[in-house]
């Protein structure tokens, strides 16, 4: 196994996250369920990893015909939200069927939307 070094930065606010991520070779991390695996497999070798968990993007806003979800909301939290369960039950069902409880507890909604490469074999092949 080849070991390589990288810089880890914990961003406390959005300007700090943007500044840390502006350097070449930086990757943002929230749940890390994809990035950590890609780093282990040496598919990704970022020079800097920027932890964005301190940023305030964890809101879930349920309206009669709309759902707004912050990028840092965990899959578990979205699936368990009473408003989502009532108004958008198919989202709850999809989230609960999509991964193990351990992954759902770590994985962020934003990270799942922005996976590189996608984990879903369908999207990898299309």
Descriptions of predicted regions:
Residues 1-126:
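C-terminal structural segment of proteins
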């Amino acid at each position: 196994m080849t070991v390589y070094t990288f810089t880890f930065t914990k961003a406390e606010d959005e300007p700090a996250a943007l500044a840390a991520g502006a350097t070449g070779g930086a990757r943002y991390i929230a749940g890390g369920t994809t990035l950590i695996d890609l780093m282990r497999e040496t598919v990704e070798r970022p020079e800097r990893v920027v932890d964005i968990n301190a940023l305030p993007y964890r809101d879930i806003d349920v309206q009669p015909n709309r759902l707004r979800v912050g990028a840092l909301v965990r899959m578990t939290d979205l699936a368990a939200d009473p408003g989502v369960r009532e108004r958008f039950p198919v989202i709850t069902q999809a989230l609960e069927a999509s991964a193990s409880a351990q992954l759902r507890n770590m994985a962020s909604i934003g990270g799942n939307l922005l996976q590189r490469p996608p984990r879903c074999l369908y999207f990898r092949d299309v």
